[in-house]
Amino acid sequence: MRVHDDPCNPNPAPLYLGLMSGTSVDGIDAALVRINANAITHCELIAAQTSAWDPNLRTTLLELSQGQNTASLDQLGWLDAQVGLAFATAANTLIAKTGIKHTQIRAIGSHGQTIRHRPHGDLPFTWQLGDAHRIAELTGITTVADFRRRDVAAGGQGAPLMPAFHLAILGSANENRAVLNLGGIANLTLIPMTGPVLGFDTGPANALLDSWYQRHHHETFDQSGNFAASGKINQKLLACLLADPWFTLPPPKSTGREQFHLDWVTKQLEPTPPSPADVQATLLELTAVTVADALLRQQPKTNRLLICGGGAHNPVLMARLAAHLPNVTVESIQTYGLNPDYLEAMGFAWLAAQTLDGQPGNLPSVTGARGLRLLGAIHPA
């Protein structure tokens, strides 16, 4: 795809590039967007693509995020550089395909790769790998990164960060909306017609579904939810999983693979495990039930639930959500002309714009931070 500026508009809105890899570590999403001068009301996706991880690097990152690998300082330094290199390569590859010049892009917003998220305790922290100095050096583009840590330092969860972006592009004065990102972890943004926006993680989504599927198949994910559809929900297993006290915590709350991983599931499978397909069906139902329960408790008069992330392509999961939410319109954000696969990458491009424009990127009503904060560190080109 070649991108050309409109000759009738000599001062087009600036371009930004967002980079995102989530808890599933299933690829690096790169999104080139044009954001209007206010960085509030309009964010146009110009081009996007997903770059595959090196398989060995992906395995190491998954092990780290699940606490299965204790890396040395040398290994962590090497991984930080490798992730930075992978992100820079993803950015440069997309830019080359568009035909634009690097100098036309005002900034890159890079999420990095989360390897640990500990928002509770005496000294909370969150840690994302991906050397932003290296990204700026290899792309020649100012890079804004490390968005979550300032919110954590201000007493917040550091997550989710997308609600401010969701409000900017999907808020409505006519109906109560919610945005559901079905990535590795499911998270909700609640956007009422009036009142504060809320946002929080609801529990596992693709992280568990993909991991269980990969244990029994060569492919990386359950295409169209077919494997889950071939099984039956095991109510006993579902009840055991739902008994985890994390699900009853009130917002603000966030989680990750360190909380919800395959060992968490397999501990509940003894002494007589259900069939693999039944476990897949039960994990899918777990996602649907926890999302629906959270939505009905926190915003019971929701009119519309807009879905993004990989789960938006899973018709079985979409159907289960609709079944649990009969009075809510459940639909993909594709209905609004937005690509469900790249909304988060677009969001980090938007966050970069917010930071460079001196505007806050967090919502204290979502994260629990003490106030609005500029997010991220700026690494000049």
From Swiss-Prot:
It catalyses: 1,6-anhydro-N-acetyl-beta-muramate + ATP + H2O = N-acetyl-D-muramate 6-phosphate + ADP + H(+). One of its GO terms (molecular function) is ATP binding. It is an enzyme of class 2 (transferase). InterPro entries: Anhydro_N_Ac-Mur_kinase, ATPase_NBD. Its EC number is 2.7.1.170. The keyword Mitochondrion does not apply. GO terms for biological process: 1,6-anhydro-N-acetyl-beta-muramic acid catabolic process; amino sugar metabolic process; peptidoglycan turnover. Keywords: ATP-binding, Carbohydrate metabolism, Kinase, Nucleotide-binding, Transferase. The keyword Nucleotide-binding applies. ATP binds at residues 22-29. Transmembrane segments: none annotated. Pathway: Amino-sugar metabolism; 1,6-anhydro-N-acetylmuramate degradation; Cell wall biogenesis; peptidoglycan recycling. Belongs to the anhydro-N-acetylmuramic acid kinase family. PANTHER family: ANHYDRO-N-ACETYLMURAMIC ACID KINASE (PTHR30605:SF0). Catalyzes the specific phosphorylation of 1,6-anhydro-N-acetylmuramic acid (anhMurNAc) with the simultaneous cleavage of the 1,6-anhydro ring, generating MurNAc-6-P. Is required for the utilization of anhMurNAc either imported from the medium or derived from its own cell wall murein, and thus plays a role in cell wall recycling. This is Anhydro-N-acetylmuramic acid kinase.
